[in-house]
């Protein structure tokens, strides 16, 4: 998180946190604290603002009501005055040197530590001038030499001779480009101290600040404090430093030398138990012993992955060892420790699963607010998660495979707002100067500004149901879902309640995602849903959705936005398809086989780790496969896939069949006139919907259709399929643009109605006129046999009125429109010879 003080970049807008807030993102927890400051990126809406800690970090969202926008003047850090040290607070420290190694150190902002200036000095701590800001033009190959001498001079601090000194010729770039605090890039630091101690012997001990507990001494291979005890001097019960009051040097606190085989080995460190059963750690190379788990060094190549291309310089083994050490408690920084995966169990507790042994541990907090871990079976409890001996190569493979799996399963990640690589534990009260370095375990920083998450384009509450999933029909189940259009993907999650946007809600993971690439969108027919304002979305993967809203304006807006998004995706895909799509239909089969091979290969790779070369090869093949694969519309335009009969445009269908009346319409009419004119309730009685769907499927797939087959012996199945054909037309037989004209015509005087309707029919396209003529002549013959089938002009008009004539957008006048629709059909049937001639 951001610091509460530090240098401010000129010309930028900043916000300051007024209240604490936290929420769960996809794979981490976003936490902001009162007083923290961030760089304002964008005021997304009234509820959420987009911010980031610095210009090089990933942006994330904060609630606008919890922050305030501040000016540069308000953000400038105050000038701190040096405070005198009391006589009894600190003994004379002869010399204290903070010396930077003269070796050439690589500049790595991701591995920087926070320099955390103390707000006040109350007799303890090392004093630092708040105005001591270093320039940004330091050479990373030069040496920083800081000398800080604190003398016990009558209780006063000698600022003239003992203030920090920085050589103008030996400076190093210490601070990253962050808008908040300054960042001290300390990769290898050693403290040397000469002072009085309790013990009379001579020797050296290694101590380390422990931010979690002050009751035990700990040592680390990355930060070492050496305390030399001169003879004939003593300081009973006095702290080593004034700001390290809890740490005391005690020769007897060291663990014993190992006398039995190691319980566990991790690199150079071995885990042993003493006679009381307490675990301690022993380094075979340096012979260090410590009660606290050491910080493991990260692999050189892994550390370099976090550098930008322009900053990659070779590190010496020692420098890399010291600059790449991490605390095991990585989960406190927002991500689980390396080698562990994090999830929530059914009770909402944080559950960690080992990537090596599949062992499960739970995280808990004791009554003092300290975090600890216990195994799922309750047999063990530790302050830190167990560490397992895994080679750096295996760790990289697990990291890479996990990252690949996540991208494949969840193509759009909305809540992963930032790639935070450095987190300062601001709640660490025991050790104000302790810093923690946290790097993401399964991702690398973006190499350019182009890799930003796409912005939110549209969101809102919609009713949605799936009718087909992966080519298989599913039961319709309408749900009220929160929809978010993000780039080329449409995401659905549960209702957000009072939240007005996707961001910041606890429901950060979408229920399902729809890929709009190659999708088809159209208004749904009545047989798909009886609801109003429904449109159908068909994806390239074989999923069909019905999306609905009671608000006409909302559904029309969504329809336009989704149509525009789909058209943009089709245009981009067609450009690639024109260059690389094969011209021969025979290659389509080869492409399908190749697709299946690629998918099988992809599934096998998900379960196993891959080395770097294999992963690069797979990414390249997958990218090539996705870019070369043509969209459904492009293949259909080339003639490889024929359009279906049901749901096709009438003019296109007639053009494809080289006629003006669809063949299926002729076939149904001939069959009904031959076998069904005397059937009671013909066209009014509904047929078996399942059999009708089978007939529809057979027609759409160009199967040889014989209506005299026993499968179609029910005449109501034939009439039901004919009515379904006209219902599923994208534009009804009486086209949308003439609907109001037909309604106005039927409102005229009886003598003028026929002429007006006749003139309007002549304005329709030729396929519409011819199909209308053959259909109405057939219905006239059905009515003429009314003594047998009991069908009248009114009953036929009621059946076919809403099917053949309907407005483009349903309004509140459905009942009135239904009356007009029936009257128009009835008028044409009564005046058939006048309208169409004999």
Curated annotation (Swiss-Prot):
GO terms for molecular function: GTPase activator activity. The modification Phosphothreonine is found at residues 228-229. Residues 155-239, 291-346, 425-456, 572-620 are annotated as: Disordered. Residues 291-302, 586-601 have a biased composition (Basic and acidic residues). Residues 10-72 form the SH3 domain. Residues 155-172, 189-198, 303-334 have a biased composition (Polar residues). The modification Phosphoserine is found at residues 163, 199, 211, 213, 238, 584. One of its GO terms (cellular component) is phagocytic cup. PROSITE patterns: PH_DOMAIN (PS50003), RHOGAP (PS50238), SH3 (PS50002), WW_DOMAIN_2 (PS50020). Residues 263-296, 355-388 form the WW domain. Residues 466-567 form the PH domain. The modification Phosphotyrosine is found at residue 241. It comes from the Eukaryota. SUPFAM superfamilies: GTPase activation domain, GAP, PH domain-like, SH3-domain, WW domain. Residues 648-836 form the Rho-GAP domain. GTPase activator for the Rho-type GTPases by converting them to an inactive GDP-bound state. The record marks 684 as: Arginine finger. Residues 572-582 have a biased composition (Acidic residues). Keywords: GTPase activation, Phosphoprotein, Repeat, SH3 domain. One of its GO terms (biological process) is actin filament organization. This is Rho GTPase-activating protein 12. The keyword Metal-binding does not apply. Coiled coil: none annotated.
